[in-house]
Amino acid sequence: MSRSTGGSDPHVLVIVQNLPIQVDRRVLLEFHELLARGYRVSLICPKGPGDPAREEIDGARIYKYRPAPEAKGLAGYALEFGYSWLRTAWLSLVAWREGGRFHVIQACNPPDTYWLLALLWRIRGVRFVFDHHDLNPELFLSRFGEPESRGQRLQFKGLKWLERMTFRAAHRVISTNDSYRAVAIRRGRREPRDVDVVRSGPDTTRMRPIYPSEPVPEGITMLAYIGIMGPQDGVDQVLDLVAELRRRGRTDVRATLMGFGDCLEDLKRQCTRQGLDDIVTFTGRVDKREIAEHMSRSHIGVCPDLKTPLNDLSTMNKSLEYMAYALPSVSFDLVETRVTGGDAISYVGSGDIAAMADEVEKLIDDPTRRAEMSRLARGRVVELFDWAGQAKVFGDVFDQVLGRPSAGERAPAPVPQDVDEWGRPYVPLDDDAEFERYVLERRAR
């Protein structure tokens, strides 16, 4: 499937504002698919801690800017978006000068502001693909409720206008699930043929259980959370869950919380107030190597996202990642989480911590059920959501936008390796007896 790459090959400029590229699994997979099809790729994103201003990842040029200060209030968000837009616009000029003309801009939201930059570049013949990651009007409703004051109504109308302009400016729209696709068609007034679903599926040939180098002590059950720690992510519910399990006398439960975000320090203070510092670990930002270690030693994943207008329609990457690592998980009952998890996830009513604790205890006390859900989880993510199937749809969008011949059939999947890139042995998923032993013990033999 790979095509030769050179200065005459089509050039895609990818724009991401809300995350450094190293922690945006979806966009990493996307631009590697473009590279595999012979596209040149430049990418603009904010810096993470200690990141350089320029780097190259597997042939893609990465341009980074210092992120804006943490936003507070309407003025703060306006400053953040304006600052990021201007830095991105400047770096797009740099990317054009250093990497040659680009033919497509792929803008990933939030925010819904880069349609204007795409229109400015359209005079140079650049086309625009909108990669629709978030529903910003629903995000507003989830954080603040229905707008009541004049200022809130103005903000809400502004978000809807920005979203509408983004849909209108795009030549094609890529949605993360069918709920988002329905929004693009209904609210964005896009033709169904112009909106494609590309789910944020993992590369399950690489995202799979390893034998952890530091398994948890025998008799201990490790809960895992992975994801952003913002106001809408419900990570405080994980702490409430752990506190409830301790109140019930479960001294055998620990929790590892992986990720970062605006609420991280508040969550650490909550953890201390609830007396959980001895059993809860906050890892902060983690890389692929650390994620594999923590997920492979954990027993149960937690999806604490409350039922809100945004969360109900969003696919939670954490649920897919738990499944890739053969973790059964517990979740509040959300429309798209059910689409993702099927019977591999236990669902309870939104905010019902007691019911979630009940489900965790059932999984701890019923090894047979835990093993069955682990097997279901891994099988479901491989069969329905593996990135290989999503990648073809994604790459075909760009080929069609530029009128390129289709890449045709994808190359056969690589032969599974016995070890990961750091030399750590994978769990043999085709050995039924060993797989069942592993998912119960989460350690090497």
Could you say what each language-model-derived stretch is?
Residues 265-292, 300:
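Nucleotide-activated donor-binding/catalytic signature segment of Leloir-type glycosyltransferases, i.e.
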Residues 362, 369-384, 393-396, 411:
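A short, well-ordered alpha-helix in the C-terminal region of glycosyltransferases
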